[in-house]
Amino acid sequence: MIPQQSKAKQVAITTMVAAMYAILFYGSAPGMLPGFTLLYLPVILLGVFPLWFGWSGLAGCMIGAFIGGVYVEQVAPYAAWVESITALIIFGLNWILIPRNAVENRTKRNLILLMVVYAISLFVGTAYILWQYTYLFSIGILAFNILAGFSFGIVLAATYGLNLVIQLVVCPVLLRTVTPRLKSWGVYSGNFAEWRKLRAKY
């Protein structure tokens, strides 16, 4: 059974997640186009935090993404919300689409399902952020073109491919090894269906 978390624990989780997200965002800085990180290490968190921390994790990821957009990519605060929306898209799709069995039953079928969800959510999120930043540049809100002279398709393929490999390699291992311990500590949220079921009981 997944326990209900106290407000204090939820706030602590949100703060911790935001800090970790911002730190990994900073670690992505070497792989940057002007104002945009090709290498996006926070995808690791977006692949596991939905199941681990639920709403608290989502809030932390959106805050950390905004901080990273402003201080790492040097995007103006009035445009850095794009980073938060991207985190929301990827986090939300993973939270909704990852089946519970993908974590509990370690079979090839469940691993494939998990990887398919990662591939879909990351593609949607990557395509969104590139489109949104390109659009903001075209209407004069963003001062620089993140494509840096490359075509949209090339930047999308490079960004998506690089980060998908990272997510597919790291996230399943983290889910398999860390999840049992988090459950024993009472901080595991489960997928969206599990979270809703828990909320209905209280």
What do these predicted regions represent?
Residues 1, 64, 171-174:
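Extended hydrophobic/Leu-rich segments
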Residues 1-59:
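Hydrophobic transmembrane alpha-helices
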Residues 12, 16, 20-23, 63, ...:
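Lipid-exposed faces of alpha-helical membrane segments in multi-pass integral membrane proteins
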Residues 20, 44, 48, 52, ...:
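Residues within alpha-helical transmembrane segments of multi-pass membrane proteins, especially transporters
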Residues 26-41, 73-202:
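Membrane-embedded alpha-helical hairpins and interfacial helices in multi-pass inner-membrane proteins
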Residues 57-69, 114-118:
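Central hydrophobic cores of alpha-helical transmembrane segments
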